Amino acid sequence: MILPGALHISLVQAMVVPNVQVGAQNLSSHPAGAFTGEVAAEHLRDYGINWALIGHSQRRLLFGETQETCAEKVKLARA
């Protein structure tokens, strides 16, 4: 599995061999909508992305993400 930055997902998808999956480094804790700069789970699915890294220590430390935030992301990812 490769988890490129959001801007490079489609480029990496075009380069990987069939048995390598591409995922996202992050996804929004909000549904698709007017959340500037956020990448919604729904939008990732539109690009064939079925995996996202949720709960990474950097997101928790630098952005203050909590268990509740992570739970919301999981809920949206599974929807």
Sequence positions of predicted segments:
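Active-site loop-to-helix "anion-binding N-cap" substructures in soluble metabolic enzymes
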Residues: 1-79
